[in-house]
């Protein structure tokens, strides 16, 4: 991570000193778009997995997670997996939102 941050800082210094560079700007825009698409694909896969549990247990994931966190559902392996998938999807959605705010 440190190497990446160092490179970004170097680019920032370069742009501040020499002005806007179309190639760098386009490359960064494409990189951001690629990462957003990557997040979309991961969220889509996790949402598909969550739908399986929602069909089996006839319950929305957000309702399930609230009940699970309150300890009302026990430690069934399905529930542990469902909870993990739900948390992973929510984390990815938060990260995607952060990345979108840079556009």
Regions found by a protein language model. Give the residues of each.
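Short E/K-rich amphipathic alpha-helical oligomerization segments
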Residues: 51-73
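K/E-rich alpha-helical interaction surfaces of small helical-bundle regulatory domains
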Residues: 76-88
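Extended, helix-rich structural scaffolds rather than catalytic motifs
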Residues: 3-4
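Short, charge-rich amphipathic alpha-helices with coiled-coil/heptad character
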Residues: 9-33
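Surface positions of alpha-helical coiled-coils, especially the charged/polar e/g heptad sites
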Residues: 21, 28, 35, 42, ...
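Amphipathic alpha-helical coiled-coil segments
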Residues: 32-46, 50-53, 85, 89-92, ...
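Non-catalytic, well-ordered alpha-helical scaffold segments
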Residues: 9, 44-47, 62, 79-80
């Amino acid at each position: 991570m440190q190497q990446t941050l160092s490179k970004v800082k170097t680019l920032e210094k370069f742009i501040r000193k020499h002005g806007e560079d179309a190639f760098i700007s386009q490359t960064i825009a494409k990189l951001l778009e690629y990462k957003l698409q990557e997040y979309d694909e991961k969220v889509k896969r996790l949402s598909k997995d969550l739908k399986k549990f929602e069909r089996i247990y006839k319950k929305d994931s957000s309702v399930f997670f609230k009940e699970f966190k309150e300890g009302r559902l026990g430690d069934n392996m399905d529930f542990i997996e469902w909870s993990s998938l739900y948390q992973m999807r929510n984390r990815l959605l938060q990260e995607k939102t952060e990345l979108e705010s840079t556009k």
